[in-house]
Structures are given as structure tokens and as C-alpha cells.
Amino acid sequence: TTKNLPATMRFFSEITGVKYPYPKYSQAFVEDFGGGMENISATTQIIEIIHDERELLDDDSESLQSHELAHQWFGDYVTTRDWGQIWLNESFATYMQAMWTEKLKGHDEFLYSDVRNNQNTVIQTWNSGNRRPVVTKYFADKDAMFDNYAYPGGGSVLHMLRKHLGDELFFRSLKHYLTRNAHQPVST
């Protein structure tokens, strides 16, 4: 389940231009937990993502593992000024997860499983009448900020930005964003 974690960490360090920012990285797998939660140098994740060799034929935990690891850069090393800016943490982690899919499984899988699904999720959310800007301070309840606009919506925005800027400028911009704002809160 965690065998690709060192490669994921190296990949994220390479594409951001920022070496993994902490001296260690730990993970805990627990029951009765909703997905994953990053903390500085430590992540808690649901135990159901641990798969044996047979289960790995049908499913893997790469998306959750890479998403939570990406938060070490986008969420911990650089974090948001307030909850209205949560998209900066979640969309970058979502898009980093997508780029790990691209590295691991190829460009077609990246486009189909991540980019297309992110865009379709946002379109369906919008069409269902749940509409809001990516950045907002107004939520129906405290959990509403962790929605389809913060995760796949923001990830879609980052993909559009990458396509507009081109890879060289996009990745140079990631490095600038992280190094300029290291250990500081940011806003859009």
C-alpha cells in the first residue's frame, strides 16, 4: 500500500522545486475515520486503504496517499490565511494527486480519471443548483467548505492554468509560490 510513497515524495519535490520540507513523514491507519487528514510530517488515514497483493489488482490507495502527502507542501509548508481560502490547500493537493496519476499510470489515465472526472464533478454540482465561487467565506455549515469547489473545482482551475501557462512556467510558478510563502498563511 505504501511502497510508492518514497517515489511520490521525490516526484513532488521535483515538480515543485521544493525538497520535502520536514525531517520525517509518518502515517497512521485507523478505524472509523473519514478518509485522510494531514498534519505536519504525519498523516492519519482510514485503515481500509491498506490492501494486500490480491486487492491491489482491483484497487490501490495511490490517490489518497498522494493527496495527503501533497498537503505537506500545500497545507502545511504553505497554508491558508482563513477557511474561505481552503481551496488553496485542497485544490493543490487534488492536482498534485492527479499529476502523480499521470506519472504512475500515464497521460491518458490522468486525463480520463482525474482531469475529466474533476471537471464533470464540478459541472454536475453546478447543474444541481449548488453554486458558489471557489473562494468564499459563506458556508451553510462548518463542513460545507470541503466540497466539490474546493477539491475538483480548484483542481480543474489549476489544470486550466497549467495548460494556459505551459509546463515550464506552471512548475516554475509552483516553486515561486512555495518558496515565497514558506511557513506563512496565504490568500487568493
PLM regions and their residue ranges:
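Hydrophobic alpha-helical and helix-loop surface patches within well-folded domains
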Residues: 1-188
